[in-house]
């Protein structure tokens, strides 16, 4: 059953919504017009034309004061602006770093020959080796007061070397690093599968199989075959004895 006879409910709802929107729009327009029509209030701080005499009187009184006189407010501001005298000691600027001088090092070899080298405190042990022994830095060992200088990244300044100090230098003849020795009681393992160690057990197994066939099937083995088998057995026994002899 429809709300209005002859008119669908959808049309009725649409016109109702449009009517509500129209009423709201008219109400908003009327409110905006009423707010825009109100006169702006005049600020209270703005001087009115009726007060020129008071302003002129105040200006004349300020001009009549002595030029050297200061108001209490200005005097207070001047005192606040003056810096307070410091009571502590004045900070002295840090002295500039003294320039570093190069180190003079005496490299002493095993044959009592010496070589003078100059280096900076920030240079490392590795850079000293590369400079004095180019291409042989891996073969050079430096010793200072019985201590091996093995850390190539250590700087010379961290060692606190005195002037004209002596560094004992040992030059090795080997190019590569030596292989670490095997601990006692241990032997190096085989690098891979050794076929020679398996050949002799296979031959022994084959020899046992032939002797088994010779005993079980004697008619098939003539005298020459038996003698050949015996000679092969003797040869294989001598070979096994030579290989496994302590």
Curated annotation (Swiss-Prot):
InterPro entries under this entry? Answer: TMUB1/2, Ubiquitin-like_dom, Ubiquitin-like_domsf
Location in the cell reads:
Membrane; Postsynaptic cell membrane; Recycling endosome; Cytoplasm
Q: Please list the GO biological process terms of this entry.
A: ERAD pathway
- Known tissue expression: Ubiquitously expressed with highest levels in mammary and thyroid glands, bone marrow and spleen; limited expression in cardiac, pancreatic and ovarian tissues.
Which keywords belong to this entry? Answer: Cell membrane, Cytoplasm, Cytoskeleton, Endosome, Membrane, Nucleus, Phosphoprotein, Postsynaptic cell membrane, Synapse, Transmembrane, Transmembrane helix
Chain positions found as Phosphothreonine = 71, 92
Q: Biased-composition ranges for Pro residues? A: 40-50
Q: Where is the Ubiquitin-like domain?
A: 103-176
Using the UniProt annotation, give all residue ranges assigned to the region (Disordered). Answer: 34-101
Q: What is its main location?
A: membrane
Segments traversing the membrane = 11-31, 195-215, 221-241
One GO CC term, this protein: centrosome
Membrane topology of this protein: Multi-pass membrane protein
Residue ranges of the region described as Required to release iHOPS from membranes: 2-30
Phosphoserine modification sites are 73, 98, 127
Q: Quaternary state and partners of this protein? A: Interacts with EEF1A1, GRIA2, GRIP1, CAMLG, TUBG1. Interacts with NPM1 and CDKN2A; TMUB1 can enhance interaction between NPM1 and CDKN2A and is proposed to bridge the proteins; proposed to be mediated by iHOPS. Interacts with ERLIN2 and AMFR; TMUB1 promotes the interaction of ERLIN2 with AMFR.
Q: What does this protein do?
A: Involved in sterol-regulated ubiquitination and degradation of HMG-CoA reductase HMGCR. Involved in positive regulation of AMPA-selective glutamate receptor GRIA2 recycling to the cell surface. Acts as a negative regulator of hepatocyte growth during regeneration.
From the Swiss-Prot or TrEMBL record, give the protein name.
Answer: Transmembrane and ubiquitin-like domain-containing protein 1
